[in-house]
């Protein structure tokens, strides 16, 4: 079936691509000598096993309908395509439980004050090596 082929292709993709992404990220981080903080953006951080590559995880949360609208606008994707991508990802509540910090990006709460608090906490709690 198409689903089985898709799953098999996905497994091959994960085995080949994720190690390369991890290696490229590690090399990139090593080149950022003058940066106090560096970040990795990944919608599938936990699914790809990248949580062990970072010192702290900041989950950016937005209501699902807002995420769908933003992704449709940004990517030119259909609602069905975006919903399928979201369905393939870990549940938001599970991500929130696992994350060290959460930023709410709902268009109402201000982002910069949230990020400033997190950066200060990272410095204070010695997440930064």
Describe each region flagged by the PLM:
Residues 17-21, 118:
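Hydrophobic/aromatic residues within well-ordered alpha-helical segments
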Residues 1-9:
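Single conserved hydrophobic/aromatic residue that forms the stacking wall/gate
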Residues 25, 52-53, 73, 77-123:
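Small-molecule kinase domains that catalyze NTP-dependent phosphoryl transfer to phosphate-bearing small molecules
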Residues 124-129:
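A short, charged, Gly/Pro-tolerant segment at domain boundaries
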Residues 23-74:
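ATP-dependent NMP and nucleoside kinases share a basic, alpha-helical "lid"
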Residues 12:
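Active-site loops and adjacent core secondary-structure elements that bind or stabilize anionic groups
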